[in-house]
Amino acid sequence: MNKTGYASDPFYLLHETEPHPENPGRLTAIQNRLESSEFYNNLTPIQPRKATVDEIANIHDLGYIASVEQNCADHNRNLDADTVISQDSYNAALLSAGAGMTAIDQLVDGKINNAFCAVRPPGHHAEQDRAMGFCLFNNVAIAARYAQKIKALNKIFIFDWDVHHGNGTQHSFYNDPSVYYASAHQHPFYPGSGAEEETGTGEGLGTTLNLPMDAYS
């Protein structure tokens, strides 16, 4: 029988963002729905670990990482107009980024066949040097680099299925032929990227695929 891992942690709820749309209620709703389902007891629990600064720095500038930590320590409320933070957001973001890497460890070790990571803050809008669209660190991009550097998984395919285009993830690998990034998203819509013509650059030309879709299509 295939084993599906489930990575989450109550600490994610301490990334306090109410009344922002990206708030702890999103994870609470997921957890409640899973617990009421017939397959919940068949999930393999995964306890996420915190990502290290070095692991985050595979994708993000060190200065940006330090600024997120400092803004949270200073009890600032926003990193930008869209991205709300609280005192515990930095550590929640480290734990969020670590979930994907923990899941990869278990996948490679044969303990699970696939995994679902219910984490926050989210990540696919986060750019190399800045927060964007509710996102602090690019969780998927960080996990992809970890899979390559630590687990020797040289070729990575990322499928991003979201109403919003994952600009940060795309930009992380736009000139990298070892990571194929595909996105299906509503267009035109936030953040304005993700046109069909965006297919990569340099050695990465042809390794980005965007599938912009009309609303309700």
Predicted regions and their residues:
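HDAC/HDAC-like amidohydrolase catalytic core signature
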Residues: 1-217
